Amino acid sequence: MPNLLEKTRKITSILQRSVDSLETELPYNTMASRLADIIDCNACIINGGGSLLGYAMKYKTNTDRVEEFFETRQFPDAYVKAASRVYDTEANLSVENELTIFPVESKDIYPDGLTTIAPIYGGGMRLGTLIIWRNDNEFSDDDLVLVEISSTVVGIQLLNLQTENLEETIRKQTAVNMAINTLSYSEMKAVAAILSELDGNEGRLTASVIADRIGITRSVIVNALRKLESAGIIESRSLGMKGTYLKVINEGIFDKLKEF
């Protein structure tokens, strides 16, 4: 039977795995699943807004109403607010506690159900909550040590991802600003007209038609597109007689054009 050290190593080894994006569907399923296996419980991880980041169900404990929270990947506001007021791990909460994960309609079915809540911090900020639960049997001190470690590991990953996302946002904003600064007034006018022709972030356009409509030469449009493409703002592909296919890959250009 694995001892506490071996269990800890299994959890901390997750730090060696990368979570590419918080936009990924349920990016923390691996952590929740590993914790559920090691501690023998159900587990889920939510962010500060109550969105589900990952979960693992070893045992059936919930009704259809609660299962819907997991299907929609969003916990109720009332529960999220109550959980956000937990600043240290709250262990072995009974089915009568407001933080129990067991639904009120199943209290008689699981009278000995126990829930443990652990806040997730990173860089001094509250980033989310780790929730584990069992139908019976209290969580031991060893279990709670693993919960604390797990919440720390998730906190580190969340903080790193937020930092990476911020750096990527700054990089894109800088690229847009630099590209805009190279455009003449006529080219800016052309870019605004071009992007308004797109269906969302991509579409087909004919430079000569746009040039005639806004009263500029076709070469101005071509130069503007070339500058945006070299800056990594757009991708384009000639369609021959049908015009040009255009795709915006840095959406910051739309916000910048609102200032034009």
Swiss-Prot record:
Domain of life: Bacteria
Gene3D superfamilies: 3.30.450.40, Winged helix-like DNA-binding domain superfamily/Winged helix DNA-binding domain (1.10.10.10)
Keywords: Cytoplasm, DNA-binding, Repressor, Transcription, Transcription regulation
Any Pfam family the entry gives: HTH_CodY
Entry keyword annotation includes Transcription: yes
MF GO annotations: DNA binding; DNA-binding transcription factor activity; GTP binding
GO BP annotations, alphabetical order: negative regulation of DNA-templated transcription
DNA-binding region per Swiss-Prot/TrEMBL record: 207-226
Annotated spans, GAF domain: 1-159
GO cellular component, one term: cytoplasm
Main location: cytoplasm
Subcellular location: Cytoplasm
Family classification: Belongs to the CodY family.
Function: DNA-binding global transcriptional regulator which is involved in the adaptive response to starvation and acts by directly or indirectly controlling the expression of numerous genes in response to nutrient availability. During rapid exponential growth, CodY is highly active and represses genes whose products allow adaptation to nutrient depletion.
NCBIfam families: codY_Gpos, PRK04158.1
Name the UniProt record assigns to this protein: Global transcriptional regulator CodY
